[in-house]
Amino acid sequence: MHTVIRQMSQLRLQAMPSSALLKATASASAPSALDHSGAAVNHHSLHTAAGSGGALCASWNKHNNGPRKWLVYNKTVHPPQQPDEEPRKAYVCHMRSNIKYSPDKMWYIAAFVRGMSVDEALKQLNFVLKKGATDVKETILEAQEMAVQRHNVEYKSNLWVAESFVGKGRVFKGMRRHARGRFGQVEYKHCHYFVRLEEGQPPEHYYQEPQTPEQQYEHWLEQMRSRKVINSL
């Protein structure tokens, strides 16, 4: 049956004049190109990776330009110091917004590099097998370059990660087809990564220093002795 249909179509094309054949092919090619471009727009309208760069689509992101206050700290003008005061450490704040990664997953990487020197953080991030580690590493490298070029830091290795945290970005909701005509909801999450590098060597204990059992006992005993007795003189 397919052979018969193919032969009939070939006979119809042979019988058609050349001018009509050219018009038919031109009219067929124009809608195909139009449909192709329209299909591309329709496909991208359901996803966040529109455009060649894979960034957020401009039509989706009109009313949200990302966080703005974090970079304002770089423009802070501090008052002059007295000669006997300790020199104020230089710092630089940097961020990367709208990263196509879950903020819950990025939190582990951001908390991992807190309190490390820049060289140690970059070295450790090479062994973190997570997608967000690449963005964190690139952001720290950009902040390191900014500190040397714009914030009068003499040695780029004399920096440590003073702050490193994550913010929640935009969440786009989509649909995923399931079997038997059903569908499921999909969330395309984005996050913002913030980092602040400070000049100098990192502290020995970035978080609270762990206490020995004797210190814990003394602290508990002090709390017990400082209790207030209700309705007493």
UniProtKB/Swiss-Prot annotation:
It is found in: Mitochondrion. Belongs to the universal ribosomal protein uL22 family. SUPFAM superfamilies: Ribosomal protein L22. The lineage of its organism: Eukaryota, Metazoa, Ecdysozoa, Arthropoda, Hexapoda. The keyword Transit peptide applies. One of its GO terms (cellular component) is mitochondrion. It comes from the Eukaryota. CDD domains: Ribosomal_L22. GO terms for biological process: translation. Component of the mitochondrial ribosome large subunit (39S) which comprises a 16S rRNA and about 50 distinct proteins. This is Large ribosomal subunit protein uL22m. The keyword Protease does not apply. Keywords: Mitochondrion, Ribonucleoprotein, Ribosomal protein, Transit peptide. GO terms for molecular function: structural constituent of ribosome. It comes from Drosophila pseudoobscura pseudoobscura (Fruit fly).
